A protein has these predicted regions:
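Active-site capping/gating segments
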Residues: 89, 93, 168-213
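A short acidic, Gly/Pro-enriched loop at the edge of an enzyme's catalytic core
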Residues: 125-135
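Conserved beta-strand/loop positions that form the S-adenosyl-L-methionine
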Residues: 72-74
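Conserved SAM-binding loop of SAM-dependent methyltransferases across substrates and taxa
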Residues: 76-89
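Conserved SAM/SAH-binding loop
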Residues: 121-126, 141-142
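Conserved beta-strand signature within the Rossmann-like core of class I S-adenosyl-L-methionine
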Residues: 158-171
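Helix-to-beta-strand junctions that scaffold the AdoMet/dcAdoMet cofactor pocket
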Residues: 87, 155-157
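Class I SAM-dependent transferase core
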Residues: 1-70, 86, 100-117
Length: 213
């Protein structure tokens, strides 16, 4: 099977990823080898695998503290597996409804020797009541007004949403104004990161879930 060309590792990867770079190289090689065949990534995504996917996910790992994180719709492992590689002090639960992708996440976490990964082959809404997390993230899942009611039940009181968004995030926040209030979200804001590490800009929507009275 012919594989698409893979983006060379950018110089900024060393600065951003530090000691995790070796494991991320192994992960990138596996995505390049199996990604198209398993339907994890499209052929046009491999020529920006590092910049758009791996480094983009690595930026999130720099924004959170130790604790627990759930990645909703983890897919090929962006950002969940990348966070797990970079942050052994974060216990990562990868929630993925598609069986072949969940199997990939299980197999890849074992190949990489990650002891801080749990994979749930379920829809996010079906996991409600099983656990709550310090952080919940999602990437390229849906607009905030749809996504927030889905993921807030997974966040512990006082925990935080850290949702990876695109350039339309400000409009999404305006569209979701009533949803933010209804779901008890505090201090909603957009954090822009990336240029300080010499890589592309990434926008992260952050909001804290209110403590119970």
């Amino acid at each position: 099977m012919k594989h698409s060309a893979v983006e060379p590792e950018p110089e900024s990867a060393s600065t951003l990823c530090g000691e995790a770079l070796s494991a991320l190289r192994s992960f990138a090689a596996d995505v390049a080898l199996y990604g198209e065949e398993l339907g994890l990534v499209g052929p046009r995504e491999l020529d920006r695998l590092w910049t758009r996917h791996i480094l983009n996910s690595a930026l999130l790992a720099r924004l959170i503290g130790a604790g627990t994180l759930a990645d909703v719709g983890s897919g090929a492992g962006f950002p969940g597996l990348v966070v797990a590689i970079m942050r052994p002090d974060v216990s990562c639960t990868l929630i993925e409804p598609l069986g072949r992708r969940a199997t990939w996440l299980e197999d890849e976490s074992k190949r990489l020797g990650l002891g801080n990964v749990t994979v749930l082959n379920q829809r996010a809404e079906d996991t409600v009541g099983q656990a709550q997390y310090d952080y919940v993230t999602a990437r390229a899942v849906s607009a905030l007004k749809t996504l927030i009611p889905l993921v807030v039940p997974l966040v512990r009181p006082g925990g935080e949403l850290v949702l990876m968004k695109g350039q339309r995030v400000d409009q999404e926040i305006r569209d979701a104004a009533s949803v933010l209030v209804r779901n008890g979200l505090q201090d909603p804001r957009v954090q822009i990161t990336g240029p300080e590490y010499g890589t592309e800009e990434t926008r992260v929507f952050r909001a804290r879930v209110a403590e119970k009275a």
